[in-house]
Amino acid sequence: MTKTIKYYFLLLIIFFITSCGTREFLGFEKKKIRLEGKRVSILNEDRIKESDLVKSSTNIILEKTTVLNNWPQSYNSPSHLSINHLSESKLDSFKFVVSGTGENKQSKILSQPVIDKNLLFFLDAKSNVISFDLKNNKILWKKNISLKSEKNHNIGGGIVVYKSTIIVNSAYGQIISLDKLSGKIIWKINVESSIRSAPTVFDNKLLSLTLSNKLYVLNGDNGNILWQHQGIFNNTTLIDSPKVAVDENIVIVPYSNGDFFALNLINGKEIWRNSFIDLGIKETTNAFSDIDAFPVIKKDIVIISSALGKLIAVNKKNGNKLWSRDITTTQTPLVNGNSIFLVNQNKEVICLNLLDGGRRWVLPIEKELSDNNKYIWLSPVLINSQLLLVGGLKKLISIDALSGVILRKKNLSNFPASSPLIVNKKIYLMLRNGDIIQIE
């Protein structure tokens, strides 16, 4: 009888020890209180339903096609406004141009190459800045900007052409000026944290946004700091990082905690502040509130999106909200004419009316093209009045911008690292394996 009692007593002890919450019961931990409110997914998984967007009755108007001779910075514009590129490409074949080091688990390519006077400059996955002569088909110089102690951790960074120099935002927390012809260092400054996006150039100023949500504005000639602006640090962030947008005398700064500011370009004085959290986008802030897509400015309208699941338009001068839509994208929207083209939830391409956010068309992307939506689609570009979309499972898609109908599908040799760039009617694309190809 005594043995039986001891046996049951032992089972009772084991039950208490192994039960969930025992550490709280015994006083080793404070009792966890379940927070009130509805539990929501960090990222909404639903596609846009037909009823979710008001249908626009206006027609799509695209700008006339234009030929660019240079591509000095990402999206070729400090405002990130897209043009309708004229190209001779038939989207039939691919020609190898040049190659750098490709990605691995600890090294990522996050920015576009740039082109100036037939010279192609790009940053590979090992932080090599490479200059390539497109006319003579040869590498002119290569400069490694990584730190000796951290050569295996190259996530992001970006480059821009500034006068006779190449400005590099380094993943190692440096902003570096290189001579465009030789690659020699002209000046460099240290900043407090890594930079994953390229600089924005405007009015002889360089604007670089760090991973710690600090904006540095430098004199492009000598690297002197003109002013700085600090946002709130966010320790839950996605891998990409946005660029600031500039138009006239206003700088639109997106921070990874969901805040975005309009600052005076001359002195950094705050003009207005807004936030996706303040706008009531979500009932919880315990999520990815990242703004990874670049803000886009057209006249007095700013288009900005968050991973929390909202696309909004605000007035550039006062920050007042013009409209908002339940759309989730980490890729920069394409704004041209009276329309916005973007990828929602990595599942569909949407065309919206710029003025009111009304839906013009929605194109679901076949799951097979991205292995059941596993692989990301990058920002579309507008070429010959067609949307060119790259990403998914090594795919290239051409879409009629007026109707949303797929015109062509092609397989790529590798995953794209950035959206295409178009110079002198030629289309170039950087791949994650370090190759740059021409789409012919």
Residue ranges, per PLM feature:
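Structural signature of WD-repeat beta-propellers
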Residues: 124-125, 154, 163, 170-171, ...
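Bacterial Sec signal peptide processing site at the extreme N-terminus
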Residues: 14-48
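Hydrophobic beta-strand positions that form the internal "hydrophobic ladder"
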Residues: 120, 166, 206-207, 251, ...
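A short helix->beta-strand "capping" segment at the edge of beta-propeller domains
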Residues: 42-58, 85-106
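Loop/turn-rich, solvent-exposed surfaces of beta-rich toroidal or solenoidal domains
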Residues: 342-354, 358-399
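Extracytoplasmic beta-rich repeat domains
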Residues: 90, 94-114, 142-160, 186-203, ...
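Short loop/turn segments that connect beta-strands within beta-propeller blades
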Residues: 133-137, 179-183, 219-223, 265-268, ...
